[in-house]
Design a protein with these regions (language model features):
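Core nucleotide-handling region used for phosphoryl-transfer chemistry
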Residues: 1-185
């Protein structure tokens, strides 16, 4: 017997094993942040785990206050949820030696040299874009380690984005299995 009261839910299409083009960006060591813009209004500010608000106990390293103080710039981002990393002075030991706190957008398809973000908002660096291989990821990590030594900062690692799968994975120099598992390099 067929139940006509149940709504059909299709099984998702499974992509082929060929991963195709990837984008590797630098993983910044800060705190995850997001600004939500709807109807030309900032309707939300959040961290990775919670909504934020201006105030000592409701903010996250001053990100909500920064958004409040710079609303016009953040509204220039347009509609949507704009995820990124809030990093710099006073956050995670400031391993990039930034002179102040900065917000770096993750979406390199939307933002970058081809479409610069508003002044005072940054974009994570694209380190590689092309075909996927383990060797490419390893070479990119090694290159980042060398270039960061020359620039005088300590990198956290890379994020590999698979556009075909709309998925990401992170590769870190320390705690490759997760920082809560102790020393597991």
């Amino acid at each position: 017997m067929i139940n006509t009261k149940v709504e059909f839910v299709a099984w998702p299409k499974i992509p082929r094993a060929v991963l195709g083009t990837i984008v590797i960006t630098e993983k910044l060591d800060g705190t995850n942040a997001c600004v939500i813009v709807q109807d030309n209004e900032i309707v939300g500010v959040q961290s990775r785990k919670r909504m934020l608000n201006v105030g000592k106990d409701t903010d996250n390293y001053g990100f909500a206050q920064h958004v409040f103080d710079n609303q016009e710039k953040f509204l220039e981002l347009g509609e949507g949820s704009h995820y990124g990393e809030w990093t710099g002075l006073g956050i995670q030991g400031n391993p990039h030696c930034l002179p102040e706190k900065r917000f770096f957008l993750f979406n390199t398809r939307r933002w970058g040299e081809h479409n610069p973000p508003p002044e005072g908002i940054y974009v994570v660096d694209v380190l590689y874009q092309g075909e996927y291989s383990h060797e490419v990821v390893d070479a990119t990590m090694n290159s980042l380690l060398e270039s960061s030594k020359e620039a005088g900062y300590k990198p956290e690692g890379c994020v590999v984005y698979f556009p075909k799968l709309e998925a990401m994975e992170k590769h870190t120099f320390e705690y490759s299995k997760g920082k809560w598992l102790g020393d597991n390099k």
